[in-house]
Amino acid sequence: MAVKALFADQRTDGGFAPSWAPNYSSLDATCFRLTQAEQIGVSGSEAALVRTVRFLTQRQRLDGSWEEDETVAATAPVWAQPGNMAARLYLTANCGFWMATYGGVDSAIRAADYLRNHLEPDGRLPSFLHTHWLAAGLWHRLGHGGLSRRVLSCLAARLPDMTAGNLTWLLTTLLSSGVPASDSLVQAASSMLERYQNPDGHWTSDDGPEYDVHCTLEALRVLSLTSTTSTWKGPLN
C-alpha cells in the first residue's frame, strides 16, 4: 500500500510534478520521489520505479547532463533554473546518483564524466553545497574514489555551515553509496547532527515546522546506521 501511495501521482511519462509547475514532469521532483522510494525500501524491479528511471534516462542530455526544460524558467526555483550552470550541475549529480543507485550505469557514467569536467582542484564544484555530496556519492558508487575523496575533503571544511537538514541528506547519500560509517567525515557529520537535536528530541527542518517530523525520522535513521562507532545513544527522554 505504501508503494502504491508513493507513486499514485506519477505522470504518464514516468516523472512527477513539482509544486511550482503542476502540469510538468520535473527532474528535481522525480529525484525526490526516488529518495522517498529508497527510504521505504522500494525494489528496483517495481514497475513504477522502472518507469521513473526510464523517464530520467530519456531526459538526459547528449553531454551527460540534466537540466529542467526552458518552458518552466519563469517558475522554477534557483536550484532547478534552466540555463543556470549551478542548477545543471546539481540536477546532473542528483539524477546521476539515482541512476547509479537503480541500475542506470551507462547514464550514471556519463553524468560522472560531465561533473568531473567541472571539478576544481580543491574539490569544489561551481554549484550548491548539496551538489557536492551527491557528486561524491555518485563517484564513490562508480569506484572513482579519488574524485570522491577530493569532494569529501572540501565538504569537511564546510561542516560548520551545515544545518540538520544538510547533515541528514549528506549522511544518507554517502552511506547509501557505500561510504563506511567509520569514515572520518561521516563520523564528524554524525556528531554534529547529534548536537542539533532539540531538547524534546526532534530536529528542525530547513523547510519549516511541517517538515520537522520528516527531518527527525531521517536523522534517526542515519544515526542508527552510524551508531556502531558514533556516541549517539538515541533520542532524548
Language model region names:
Residues 1-237:
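Preference for long, amphipathic alpha-helical scaffolds in soluble/luminal domains
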